[in-house]
Amino acid sequence: MPGMPPVDSLSIIAGGWANHQGLLTRALHDLTPEQLGLRTAPQQWAVWQLAGHMAGSRAYWFHDWLGEGDASVRDLFRVEQTTVPDLPLEDAGWEDDEDRPRTASELVEGLAVTWDLIHACLMRWTPDDLTANFTRRRSNGERTVERGWVVWHVLEHDIHHGGEISQILGCYGLPPLDV
């Protein structure tokens, strides 16, 4: 088909994901602190927490698991304290410190930095590269995952939480992601 990338490329995935990234960052860009604090229920995460969680999870999976990118990308999402009882600080991210809500600018930048990392990987990797295995030791044992699983997991995670953000915005009469 004309205009289609070669079969050995991940650019089809990268293109669709880039579109979702753009929809998300445009939806967040001009939100006020009050709008970023909107949530569906008191016990649910606010818009800023969902977006921060998305960005931090990207850094966690691509850096900590796959060894991609500079440590500064991962460190961007670390916090000095958490408001979540019994959550170890090394496992905490932006979303876990409700005393420090993130701004639209911080969220858009965090999503941009992590998207740049993901996009560079997708442009470099081939489908065969997705079969590589990665193992991490944690306090509860070892876990092994395939690179392709990580790509899929982070993509589905983005779509899921992006949908939550879109729904929250729409429920409050704000423009949702224009999917």
Give, region by region, the residue ranges found by the protein language model.
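Charged, low-complexity, helix/coiled-coil-prone segments
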Residues: M1-G3, Q43-W61, W94-L111
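Basic/polar N-terminal segments that are highly enriched at the extreme N-terminus
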Residues: M1-S11
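Short, contiguous alpha-helical
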Residues: L10, A14-L28, Q35-D91, T135-V179
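Residues within well-ordered alpha-helical secondary structure of globular protein domains
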Residues: D30, H53-G56, V113, R124
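Glycine-rich, flexible loop/turn motifs
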Residues: T32-E34, V73, T126, L130
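Acidic/histidine-rich alpha-helical segments that form the ligand environment
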Residues: D86-N133, W149-H157
